[in-house]
Amino acid sequence: MLRRGFIKQPPFVKIFKIVSPESTNAKATHCEVEFPLKVQELWRDKHHVIFNKPPLALSQLPDKRTWYNTHDYDPPVLLDIVQSSSGSILKDGTYEPSYYPIHRIDTPVSGGIVYAVNKQSAQQFSRNLRYGGNKGFSLTRKYVAKVGKSKTANECKEGLIKWNGAITYFQRVDNEHLILQLVTGKKHQIRKLTQQVLDSPIYNDLKYGGKKVFDSDFQIALHSAYIRTKIGFNIHEQIIPVPDGFRMIWGESVDQNGNFNEDITRVLKEDWAGTIKECLKKLKIQETKLADNQLIFVS
């Protein structure tokens, strides 16, 4: 049995003021977030499940000694929320684990997140994330970012970037939207890259220079919008809508059901595997000529 420190508390509402209404195309003056947070299950099989994570949900348990210094509510840990929904948390706060985390999503980011449903499947996903190729169960993730306009947008529309120890493939849909695929992962990888390399900070990402939309950075305009898993010969693709209650920041980028517009959806569905493979070959050649950790761009 595991103890996560899950605490059940009565429902409540947090209110966040809109400070840039032109960025949301909304008539509202604030955004209301209801707690406990709701997490939608999108798909599952005998190996894994895909949930739609809302902003504010934590991918891991925080240090409670510091959490309550800045928060007046209990930490909404994603794993606790989905375990609670499955009815597996007992009165004493313990449970037999039903889900095993494969990867993480930053707290203010929304979208698809994969959990394995048994220890063996978790090991297979971890094996692929570590070694790549055909080893284990493969996981492909694409994110949509709504960004500020960049002076270099027309010069740098798509390609593979190795920077700060991580590799990312990206494509600009238009002046305000980027789609990015993680080839190798690192903390805050996309958020740093959009600001420091692409000159396109994400809306409301105050930590990395984004345009302020709300009076808090509880949510940024970054969404895990596409997940592809390959287990043996079985391939599953999932397009993930923006969760209900968190669509305001996206304005006209999404419809009333949280689905992205046709241009964004089209790019999300594109298979970049061949292109990324060719770019990685070019990257390997360039790496032999350049110093470690130097920015490398190939297309």
Curated annotation (Swiss-Prot):
Repressor keyword on record: no
EC number: 5.4.99.43
GO BP of this protein: enzyme-directed rRNA pseudouridine synthesis
Group of enzyme by EC: isomerase
Localisation: Mitochondrion
InterPro entries: PsdUridine_synth_cat_dom_sf, PsdUridine_synth_RsuA/RluA, RluA_PseudoU_synthase
Gene Ontology molecular function, alphabetical: 21S rRNA pseudouridine(2819) synthase activity; RNA binding
Known catalytic reactions: uridine(2819) in 21S rRNA = pseudouridine(2819) in 21S rRNA
UniProt entry keywords in alphabetical sequence: Isomerase, Mitochondrion, rRNA processing
Catalytic residues, chain numbering: 106
GO cellular component, one term: mitochondrion
Main subcellular localisation: mitochondrion
PANTHER family attached to this UniProt entry: 21S RRNA PSEUDOURIDINE(2819) SYNTHASE (PTHR21600:SF81), MITOCHONDRIAL RNA PSEUDOURIDINE SYNTHASE (PTHR21600)
Similarity comment: family membership: Belongs to the pseudouridine synthase RluA family.
Protein role: Pseudouridylate synthase responsible for the pseudouridine-2819 formation in mitochondrial 21S rRNA. May modulate the efficiency or the fidelity of the mitochondrial translation machinery.
Protein name as annotated: 21S rRNA pseudouridine(2819) synthase
Protein's gene: PUS5
